[in-house]
Amino acid sequence: IDVRFMLPSCVPATPMDESGANLDYRAIDSFYDYPRVQGLAEMMNSYGVIHNDPEVVSKIVASQAHHKKIDGHAPGLQGKDLDTYVAAGVYSDHECATMEDALAKLQRGQFIMIREGTAARNLEALAPLLTPQYAERCMFCTDDKHPSDLLEKGHIDYIAREAINKYGVDPIIAVKAACHHASRYFLLNNRGAIAPGYLADFAVIDNFKDFNVEMVFKKGVLYWNNGELRDFEAPQIEEYLDNRAHDTFHVSTLTPDDFRDARQRGVLGMIPGEIITTDNGYADHVDLEKDILKIAVVERHKG
């Protein structure tokens, strides 16, 4: 597997967020020199882009100076605000929940990442994009997918399978959205297709209905063949990184009193299949009949 990275654009995500670090443009700039870094990840701070926030602009300019991609995150952005956001150099968006939103961004030159994850599922709404008219600027993504879903359903292959069998998308268009379009967008120009000059990274499936993988080739070498995995040299994991990965929660002992608060708090309404929330007023207590439950964010980095 080749693992590629997009550098974080919004850590912390908001001024009130307590993250493990504060990554300004100086903290991430040197990482652009790594060949596996493809660009700047989802620019969530659309307000900062539109209003020329100096820190946001510095991150965008740094990415452009290294000739890297800048991914977007701008649900519902419209009109002149969307014009400004795209003109700043944001090349794609994965937060489209409606055809109207997706078409507005396509018309301005963005690529659309059609998301079908665990919580946010937009394939049904955006499947009409997968036609010769629009598909060349569309690709698939999951954004967030739970490990159990990965094991039971699959990843990008699941989206392609659903597009073909549930929404009637042409199989060739679906496979291109899963492979070739994404490779082209990220400037991985020798991947995503079987052709002269391309790396021979590809899988052989049984049919478009089941998408069962029969063979997997990596750089022309057959590594998976009908249930048998060829031996390969696994990379060594540095002890330092292993220790860091298992030492990420630094939380003081919590008690019920830590979660008691009689003040009025905002109520977030949920939309099935989306991660966008609605403003449902205020409440000062849990109400099971109205399905008002309490949520809390516990800072885990500093303890």
Report the location of each language-model feature.
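Active-site-adjacent C-terminal substructures of enzyme catalytic domains
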Residues: 81, 87, 91-191, 203-211
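Divalent-metal coordination cores built from histidine and acidic residues
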Residues: 1-69, 133
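Hydrophobic faces of well-ordered beta-strands that scaffold small-molecule active sites
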Residues: 3-7, 38-42, 70-72, 92-94, ...
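Active-site microenvironment of metallo-dependent hydrolases
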Residues: 151-168, 172-303
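Short coil/turn connectors at secondary-structure junctions
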Residues: 1-3, 34-37, 65-68, 88, ...
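Divalent metal-binding pocket/active-site signature
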Residues: 42-99, 116, 120
